[in-house]
Amino acid sequence: MLGTAQAGITLVREILVRPELNLKVVGFLDEKGENIGKSLVNPSIIGSVNQVGDIVKEKGVSRVILSLNERRGCTPVEQLLQLKFSGVQIEDAHSMYEKMTGKILLTNLAPSWLFLSAGFRKSRSLLAAKRCIDIAVSLLGIILGLPLMGVIALAIWVETGLPIFFRQQRVGLGQRPFTIVKFRSMFQDAEAGGASWALKNDPRVTRIGHLLRKFRLDELPQLFNVLRGEMSLVGPRPEQTQLCAMLEKIIPMYWRRHSLRPGITGWAQVRYQYGSTVEETERKLEYDLYYIKNLSLKLDLAIILATFNVILFGRGAK
């Protein structure tokens, strides 16, 4: 690991808990060579970045990962070029972490990495195909799902009365607000005190609401949002306007998730659990950025299939 930035430490921790990767970390190389022997994680700092050529030969290293706190003036360019041309793989910590985990690590992430790395392509043909699929599937889903929606509406009315639907302002494509529609799964006036995150085992949720949420049936009315073009079948989940305003001040690049239509389901929803804190929201953003970077119909299909697993078996992320 060339450098001691937090991104590299996080990557090493991920490698250490995943023996199936068959990767062995030889050690860290410190930027200034002042902390040799210090343990960041197992293994420790074994030299300075200027010794990278000698250490690679001595240890038989096949891959060097860059995780420098400051690259300007600290990168041993000539040595890395020699290693690259001799067959040693040179990678960036963020790129390797992305491939390993299916998310983009926000720690030490420079904006330059985002615009220089491959991805974030949104061709007109891809977006047009995605929109056509949204229209066709949402229209079919509404037609076939009307009887089920009627049963759900009746069950909500019997248990807690009106209203049947829950409407709330959310932030959509280009940070434009829209009104999301869901089957009401909480008691009336559950959010009278203001915007708040959903919680696991939330006491505000009704008995029918627990069942609807378990199988994602409360999301069915969002097919109308998709048909109107406010949402997509797959995309980053839309957040409440009040929470968005707060999160954009706290989390770097949070607003980037609004570069696509929000989705009924998304990569973060099938890969992560509840996000009820700022820290958990950051983790979900890492998955959202991965989805935006790697946008494709193939990835959409994988997410939809994973969502069906949740619907059929009542388990998964929220």
Regions found by a protein language model. Give the residues of each.
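A short, structured surface patch at a secondary-structure boundary
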Residues: 198-261, 303-311
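A hydrophobic, helix-centered structural microdomain
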Residues: 125-190, 225, 297-318
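Short, glycine-rich, amphipathic interfacial segments at transmembrane boundaries or analogous
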Residues: 33-38, 97-110, 166-204, 265-286
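A solvent-exposed beta-alpha-beta segment
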Residues: 1-103
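C-terminal terminal-structure detector
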Residues: 206, 228, 251-318
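Membrane-cytosol interface motif
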Residues: 1-13, 24-27, 162-187, 206-207
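Glycine-rich flexible loop motifs, especially short His-Gly-Gly/GGXG/HXGH segments used as catalytic or interaction
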Residues: 44, 101-142, 164-168, 197-199, ...
